[in-house]
Amino acid sequence: MNNYLRKLVEGQHLTEEEMYKAGLLLLNENILESEIAAFLVLLKAKGETAEEIYGLVRALREKALPFSNHIQGAMDNCGTGGDGAQTFNISTTSAFVLAGADVKVAKHGNRAVSSKTGSADLLEELGVNISSTPNEIDYLLEHVGIAFLFAPVMHPALKRIMKIRKELNVPTIFNLIGPLTNPVNLETQFVGIYKRDMLLPVAQVLQKLGRKQALVVNGSGFLDEASLQGENHVVILKDNEIVETSIEPKKYGFSIVKNEEIRGGNSKENAKITLGVLSGEKSVYRDTVLFNAGLALFANGKAKTIEEGITLAAHSIDSGKALAKLNLLIAASNEKLERVN
């Protein structure tokens, strides 16, 4: 590890292979916590490259719990977090809207690191069993259409690193790679990131991971979600080609909503917001979810255009299908799934 730390101190980039090997060392129980913290801080200070991100993703996916089944059409809409905006759980709420539109959602997530309420905190508050095993997740994806993949369960080797990340309380490369380390072989993905200069590198990593289609967004105000505040910077991966563009919400009929207007709170407060959206209440929260879910449906290919995606998202909510998916997941995730273990 010392060789890699020296390179980072000197501001040098690591190659993909060096980062892969460094990643395996980070997961080794014999490494010192001070070495892990130093590596994460130095890497953040230098700035991460696509090669470094992919190298670490390789290491983490190699050490993750294995999945035996390929779920056709599975997607994730997990964001990086780390934007400091303290918004409500936009992507987690949107995940049920996607599921209600007949998209299989393998939602990768964790407890809060730099926010008040992470996806795991919200789902636990809503009554979802967040600790499903790979076999149970396969079952949930096949029969419910949505499953939650709790990062500490999927990546047991990350336990020490999670503790250090919490103590550091600053975004690290693990914020960036969280959405990229989903152990399910996804076909499509919608990723919100907090660092605008990482849009292209993250899209390049998704391409290397074999995604058929993907959309990476950095929202107005550097939100790690699509924002109704103004211009959103986007990179689209389709047919193995990467295109950079921008998206204005007003083009799709949305009123301007400042990011401060969609702040969330603790898990109870955010659960109330999520249930309100899924129950069809009209609000700035609903509009934000419609925009993000619409983009995700476009990224998935379920919708041919963003406009169609927004229409499908609204139907998912207003038909009751999105809320039904939440209730199904609560029930099924808490069953004793002995038949699949």
Swiss-Prot record:
It catalyses: N-(5-phospho-beta-D-ribosyl)anthranilate + diphosphate = 5-phospho-alpha-D-ribose 1-diphosphate + anthranilate. It is an enzyme of class 2 (transferase). This is Anthranilate phosphoribosyltransferase. Its EC number is 2.4.2.18. GO terms for cellular component: cytosol. Mg(2+) 2 binds at residues 224-225. Homodimer.
